[in-house]
Design a protein with these regions (language model features):
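C-terminal capping/extension of enzyme domains
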Residues: 1-16, 120-133, 155-227
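Active-site and ligand/interface coordination hotspots across diverse enzymes
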Residues: 1-75, 128-135, 181-189, 222-227
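Structural motif
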Residues: 37, 145, 195-197
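Short, solvent-exposed loop/turn segments at secondary-structure junctions
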Residues: 41-45, 109-113, 149-154, 200-204
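Acidic, metal/cofactor-coordinating or nucleic-acid-engaging core segments within structured domains
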Residues: 65-96
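Short, contiguous, well-structured surface segments enriched in hydrophobic/aromatic residues
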Residues: 95-113
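Proline-aspartate-enriched helix->loop->beta-strand connector
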Residues: 133-150
Length: 227
């Protein structure tokens, strides 16, 4: 189901090499999945963590292996719930998360929030947006979820989402008074790619938002014959 001619693994290897050269976080999960989730930032992007991250991504046995549940990690708990809703499934594990079988996750910032504030991280975020725009691996996913709030935006002056992912705004979901909203975008020349922009998943995510978003994604994947 690759949009490009190149094999997804080859696209992924190039992405890993680029991240290594740029000394940036690459991510984790299944690079051959149909869904990409882009969050705000990782909690640990020390040089040692970056090296370890790339090594784990190159290990096919490890990269989408179930992870022990961490009750403090609300982001992953919400990712798990979303993926379970999309695929109408329940994890086979009680004490582990296994959503990474069904998605690859990465971050829009290469600067952990604990180390610097958003203003100082903004230049690196802008550079990473350009990197993602030029990455065939990032662009190859059928569903891209931008769970990073105001780190990237579309407004009257700036169309970062449109320009980065070659899409156009489609529809807004949720009331304007609610913090639980999301926006869909489609590549009209190649409608196989759906881009969803929403808030960070770390806290305050409603069950209704997860269910509605899952329904939209599931319908898109069904149209493509992917589920």
């Amino acid at each position: 189901n690759s949009i490009h001619d190149m094999d997804r693994e080859k696209l992924f290897e190039k992405f890993l090499e680029d991240c290594k050269n740029r000394k940036e976080w690459c991510g984790q999960g299944n690079p051959n999945a149909d869904i990409l989730i882009i969050g705000q930032e990782s909690t640990d992007i020390s040089e040692e963590a970056l090296i370890r991250n790339i090594m784990l991504c190159r290990d096919k046995k490890d990269r989408d292996a179930p992870r022990p549940i961490d009750p403090k990690n609300k982001t992953w708990a919400n990712y798990q719930e979303l993926l379970d809703e999309i695929y109408c499934r329940k994890s086979e594990y009680i004490d582990k998360w296994d959503f990474e079988k069904f998605a690859f996750t990465t971050e829009l910032s290469s600067t952990p929030r604990k180390q610097r504030n958003y203003k100082e991280a903004k230049p690196s975020i802008k550079e990473r947006i350009v990197f993602f725009k030029d990455s065939d691996f990032i662009q190859d996913f059928s569903v891209i979820i931008l769970a990073c709030g105001g780190y990237i935006k579309n407004d009257d002056k700036v169309r970062e989402i449109d320009n980065t992912f070659h899409v156009e705004f489609c529809k807004e979901y949720g009331s304007k008074e609610s913090k639980n909203r999301f926006w869909t975008h489609i590549d009209k020349k190649d409608p196989r790619k759906l881009v969803i922009h929403t808030r960070q998943f770390s806290n305050g995510i409603s069950k209704d938002l997860i269910k509605e978003m899952a329904s939209v994604i599931r319908e898109h994947l069904r149209k493509l014959g992917l589920i």
